[in-house]
């Protein structure tokens, strides 16, 4: 990421850390190779690949790097293909050849055992309660995305393209065909430009088609329902449907056509089994850094991620995609405002939309498109939540195409609402600058009407800086009872070029081991008194060897706060049996702006979070100006 942790890569103007992973399982090797040539050039790469029996694609985010794939090799096996690796390495034109290891990535579509298979031929618009909640399926009237207001203002997603990174989309579907962007689509599983889902008897590969319909299903055509941004274009990026994922396929997907695709929607991630700690590898991190730095003509690609379906047994801060600063992590609520049974909670979630996962009423699910021209009422999971958010962001982009990836995060914080959301476990709290948040729902449910109105007048936020706020490097034991409490006092790099005054994201980069990792609980409190739960108990995680190795736990809960002062880290165990642990490292990474981000913004609603934040910034600037004047007078005397 954009600061120091683990080993570091310098790419696209960003210094970011490579997450370190360890596993006791035997590695799986795929038919994909990362190849670096001494002399960069696509013609030479094609020639080299052809001579060795490989297909080839250039990686757009790095010079000299190519994706070689061999269709004659098994897609996954336990042993390396040393013959092909050595054959490539002996070629004098090749600088490096690395066979890609495979790893698991799972779709986040929750499936209830009592789900009802209903295919509707009639329009489903009246059943799309997440667009207009009138109380359908015993829902709470008014608890929806407020798209009506955005549509009435004339914003329907026109001119915006959303890429669905998934198992493909049925681009022949009559509700999707008109809005399908073929030029921005690709199949990385089959290496061709036709990302159509692979047929299975159980319709397992319907996931991407359902997500696409939520975003871009056409309006007023008497087919299925209506997309959140029904005049937007949708691109299919097929990359999930294979035995194992590889770093090179993830990176290629995330970096695909960043000048054509505005928003990338991902409803997948590491296995949600409550015991996995995993995230993007080196190439994917590099691709994401390149995307936020160079995508959309330098305004930055917008990555929307489903926060996870592991429920109370998991923590989405153990998912390096959902907890990345470069993604907008989205959780879900059901139609009456309660949490879904599969919802994971963590401090990195920015906001929420809607799905199902608690009610047996079939109409409480998400209505959308399905395979082979069909419709469905049963889409669910945070898989359904992320595309809804992508649709809302498309509406905001139509209102203001100059929005950067960071602008979109600021707008999300400022316009999301508590509404009638109810978390039975975690209370709603206010941070040090008065912004209300929840550990599961983030800053609340997206409000499309409020977002497009604010986006119209929005001025790009100031430059972002990164500061290492301090570090604890001496090993400290975590007691079986009680807590290990550590403090770091920081000036947030004040007086230096990278001073951070107004926070956006905060990372606690931690190396720690425990006799049972799942019983470990980590909290961090800011100088302004905001407590973030960085890691909650995961009862299924029995790990006693790997722990966390330079893992960047992230919080958005201190958004807008002053980073200067004393930060407190607390580590303890929650569980029935006594455990022991050792904290080896804690590094505090601060990310934000030097100047006030909202002081120049236009305020239309004087009851809004923007009005409150701007008022506070003006008061703080005045106080600091008075303090500087007093110090100047004292020095003269």
UniProtKB/Swiss-Prot annotation:
Alphabetical list of Pfam families matching this protein: P_proprotein, Peptidase_S8, S8_pro-domain
Residues cleaved off as propeptide: 25-108
GO annotation (BP), single: peptide hormone processing
Signal peptide positions on this chain: 1-24
Record: active site: 166, 207, 383
Disulfide bridge map: 224-375, 316-346, 467-493
Residues covered by the P/Homo B domain: 460-596
Enzyme Commission number(s): 3.4.21.94
Residues bearing glycans: 374, 513, 523
Annotated compartments: Cytoplasmic vesicle, Secretory vesicle; Secreted
Top EC class, one word: hydrolase
Catalytic activity: Release of protein hormones and neuropeptides from their precursors, generally by hydrolysis of -Lys-Arg-|- bonds
Keywords, ordered alphabetically: Cleavage on pair of basic residues, Cytoplasmic vesicle, Disulfide bond, Glycoprotein, Hydrolase, Protease, Secreted, Serine protease, Signal, Zymogen
Family under the similarity heading: Belongs to the peptidase S8 family. Furin subfamily.
Protein name, UniProt field: Neuroendocrine convertase 2
